[in-house]
Amino acid sequence: MRKFKDVNELVNVLKPDYPVYCIRPNSIKKSTNYFKNNFPGKVLYAVKTNPNERVIKQIISSGIQDFDVASLNEIKLIKKIKEDSNLYFMHTVKSKESISSAYFNYGVKNFALDNKDELRKILEATNQAKD
């Protein structure tokens, strides 16, 4: 991958008419470390904010193991990159099929909910799992 001094150089050289990712690994590492060192709770990366594989790999290499996921596609992406990651299915309205697949196929044990109906759905989709 080619590196550029700054965004202006990139635009002048490539003259892109397509989206271009500008990934700054050191900035990702610095931000990740800041959160880990200053936030008193568990730090989760919300995959929906930037599901780019290179960004996620850099976040993982900086020590993040826990991910806020909102779809099966996000679950699949993270498990492909880091199989032993901890996933939190944070979408508050999920289909039974998505819950079941997340639980049985990908080992997701943490689900967000905001009402009794969603709790019932999670229990049904996981066969009344106790974990």
Functional labels for PLM-detected ranges:
Residues 1-110, 116-131:
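A charged N-terminal "starter" segment
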